[in-house]
Amino acid sequence: MSWRNQGITGSNNIPLGSRRRFAGDGEEEDGARSVTPSAPSSVTNGDRDRDRDGPVYSNDRDVKRGRSPERSEDGPKRRKKRNRWGEATENKAAGLMGLPTAIVANMTSEQLEAYTLHLRIEEITQKLKIDDVVPADGDRSPSPAPQYDNHGRRVNTREYRYRKKLEDERHKLIEKAMKTIPNYHPPSDYRRPTKTQEKVYVPVNDYPEINFIGLLIGPRGNTLKKMETESGAKIAIRGKGSVKEGKGRSDAAHSSNQEEDLHCLIMADTEEKVNKAKKLIHNIIETAASIPEGQNELKRNQLRELAALNGTLRDDENQACQNCGQIGHRKYDCPEKQNYTANIICRVCGNAGHMARDCPDRQRGASWRNDGPGAGRTAGRIGSSGGGDAVDREYEQLMQELGGTGAAPARIEAGPGSFSNGPSGGNGDAKPWQRGPTGGPAPWRTRNMDRDHEGGPGGPPSGPSGGPAPWARDRNERRHDDRDRGDSYYGGDRRHDDYGRGSSGGGGPAPWHQPPPGAPSAPAIPTAPAYPGAYGGYPGYGAPPGMGAAPPPGLPPPPPGAPPGLSGPLNALIQQYANAAPPPPPPAAEAPPPPPMDLPPPPPPGA
C-alpha cells in the first residue's frame, strides 16, 4: 500500500514532522535556523493567547518539546495595566474641587481628620453633580440579581446602586463632621434624609437550632416594643423566615425582602438611635449564641411574662428551697441531701440558716452567747433589752415616738430575764432555786395588802406583817377575811356590824353580856376547858343543863361520858359539847305581850 509511504493518514494532508507551532513564514526550508532556548516561565499563557499572531519567535524544528520559545525584543510590547495610583486627570471630581492633596504643613491628628472629612465630602458632592458615580470597569464589584418593581422596571440598576452608596456615605460623613468640626455647614445641595435605615443580619445559618425571631419579638411583641422604646428607632424583621408559612402577605415591603437573608431593618431619623438599636439587637443575638438555652435569663423572663399574660404563672417560682436555700426548685425536688444549717434558728433575729454569732441583726460589740442579762429570752419577744427581732425593735421605737415617752416599755415575759427579775434585782443571772429570799410578804399575806394599807374599819393601817398561816389562824379571823373578801367581791360595805361583833371590831363580850353603867360587875361564869381537838384560842361550847355544868346542890353528879350504848359520831358529838359553856341569856328588854285569852270573842252589838 503506497499511501503508507506517503506520510499521510486518511484525509489529513498535514505531514508528520517536527515543525513547531510558532514558525515564521519567511523561514528557510533547509531547517538551518538559529534558536535561543529560554525558561518556560518567560512567556505566560496569556501572553501567548494575546500575541499569537503578532510576535515573531525564533524557533527551530529541533527544539525540545515542552519548552516555550522566547519572544524577540523587536516585537510589540503589552500595554501596562492601570493601577490604583492613576493619573490625576482621570479623576474628574478632583480637578473640579481645587483642593490640594499633598499636605506639607504640620497638622495635628484632629486637624488632619477634619481636613480629610471635608475633602471627601467635597469629592462626593462633585461626583454627584457631574453624574460620575459609576467607577471604572476594573473597580466594579459583581452585579447583584436584578430586581423589578410592580411596573416591571428594574430598580437596582448600576447607576442607582452607586449613587445611593455615595449618598449614604456623604450623609454619615456630614453627621460626623457636624460633631467634630466647629461651625461646620454642609453643602448647599445637601438634604438631610428623613429616615436612616440600616440592616442587621441574623446568623440563622450558623445557629439553626436557636429561635432568634422568638427572642427578638418576645411574648406578644413586648421585647421588640421595649427595644424600640429604649432606642427610639423603628425595628422590623425582614427576609427569609420572617413570615410564617401559610400566611399570604400583600405588603410590598415583605414581598421584596423575602429573597434576602433574615435581618432586622432599623429605621430612625438620627444615627445615634440607629446605633443604640443595633447594640440592643447584637446583645440579644450574642447572648443567645453564647449561653445555653436553659441558662438564658432573657428567655426565662420571656416565659415568665408569657405565663403571666396567659394566667398560668405560679408565684412560688422565686421562693427559696427550705433545704438548701437556693432559688429554682422546691424542697421535695432538692438535689442535695438534708441540710442541717437550714434547721438552725438564730436566737437574735429568729430566722433560719445562721447562728447567733453570725447574725447580721446583732448589735456591734454585744455578746452572742446565752449568758447576758437577757439570756433565756426567745427571739421575737417584746422587751426593753437589745435582743429580739429588728422589726420588733423598730416597732417599739415607733411606739415610743408616738407616745412621747423616752422610757422603753417593760418586758412582758417571765423568767430570769423578766421585769421583776431583771438585772436591777441583782439575781438576774441566777437560777430560781439558787436565789435567796426577797424579803417580801408571803403570797397569802399579799391578798389583803391593799386593805391593810388603806386601813380597816376598826383602826389605822397596819401594813403587811408576819402572822400565822391560814391554817394556824382561828375561825373568827378566817371568817373575818372571808366576810371582807365577800363584801369586796359583791360591792358590800365592810363597815357594818354583824351579829355578835361590836362596831369597834374588837374581841370584847357582846352587848347583852356587858353590865349596865354603875352596876357592880357580876362574877364570871366558869367555863369548861376546850375539847382536846380544838384550835388554839377557840372557846368551848356550852353544854345543855345537867351535862357540862356543876349539878345543883343535893343532886348526884352525872355519869362521865356519854350514855352506854352510844358510839360513833354521836358519841363524838356529845363529847364535843359536854364541857362547853351555856348559851348566853336573852337581852334585857320588855316582856313580850301575853298570849291571847281562850275566851270566845264577844257577840256583835244588837245581837
UniProtKB/Swiss-Prot annotation:
A zinc finger (CCHC-type) spans 319-336, 344-361. CDD domains: KH-I_BBP. Residues 1-92, 134-155, 363-390, 407-607 are annotated as: Disordered. Keywords: Metal-binding, mRNA processing, mRNA splicing, Nucleus, Repeat, RNA-binding, Spliceosome, Zinc, Zinc-finger. One of its GO terms (biological process) is regulation of mRNA splicing, via spliceosome. Residues 521-533 have a biased composition (Low complexity). Residues 550-563, 581-607 have a biased composition (Pro residues). InterPro entries: BBP-like (IPR045071), KH_1_KHDC4/BBP-like (IPR055256), KH_dom (IPR004087), KH_dom_type_1_sf (IPR036612), SF1-HH (IPR032570), SF1-HH_sf (IPR047086), Znf_CCHC (IPR001878), Znf_CCHC_sf (IPR036875). It is found in: Nucleus. Pfam families: KH-I_KHDC4-BBP (PF22675), SF1-HH (PF16275), zf-CCHC (PF00098). SMART domains: KH, ZnF_C2HC. Residues 373-389, 534-545 have a biased composition (Gly residues). One of its GO terms (molecular function) is zinc ion binding. It comes from the Eukaryota. One of its GO terms (cellular component) is commitment complex. Residues 201-281 form the KH domain. SUPFAM superfamilies: Eukaryotic type KH-domain (KH-domain type I), Retrovirus zinc finger-like domains. Belongs to the BBP/SF1 family. Necessary for the splicing of pre-mRNA. Has a role in the recognition of the branch site (5'-UACUAAC-3'), the pyrimidine tract and the 3'-splice site at the 3'-end of introns. PANTHER family: RNA-BINDING PROTEIN RELATED (PTHR11208), SPLICING FACTOR 1 (PTHR11208:SF45). This is Branchpoint-bridging protein.
